[in-house]
């Protein structure tokens, strides 16, 4: 279960990196948003069967998806300083998500 939840987040981050920095077309932006929504939906359904304490994993992943979408917006506006700060925040949020997933599941 831990591997599954961590792998989904890593795949989302890879797709987001490609759509934000490498392939700047509308189609990849739409796919990134759809994948983020589906990731949140799958994680919400997965954590429904666990105690309330495990909802922290969902909240942290929600913050990660929101941060990635803000990064995409900042990259669209060519704010490189903001993008660098948001990339560091995304890395920090992913580390927190990783630790919570290992500890709670």
Curated annotation (Swiss-Prot):
Keywords: Membrane, Transmembrane, Transmembrane helix. It comes from Staphylococcus aureus (strain NCTC 8325 / PS 47). This is Membrane-stabilizing protein A. Plays a role in toxin production, resistance to host innate immune mechanisms, and iron homeostasis. Disruption phenotype: Decreases cytolytic toxin production, including alpha-hemolysin Hla and phenol-soluble modulin (PSM) toxins, perhaps as a result of repression or lack of activation of the major regulator of toxin expression, the accessory gene regulatory (Agr) quorum sensing system. Reduces abundance of staphyloxanthin in bacterial membranes. Significantly more sensitive to treatment with detergent, sodium dodecyl sulfate (SDS) and more susceptible to penetration by the DNA-staining dye propidium iodide. The keyword Transcription does not apply. Belongs to the MspA family. Residues 22-29, 77-84 are cytoplasmic. GO terms for cellular component: membrane. InterPro entries: MspA (IPR053572). The chain crosses the membrane at residues 1-21, 30-50, 56-76, 85-105. It is found in: Membrane. It comes from the Bacteria. It is a multi-pass membrane protein. Residues 51-55 are extracellular.
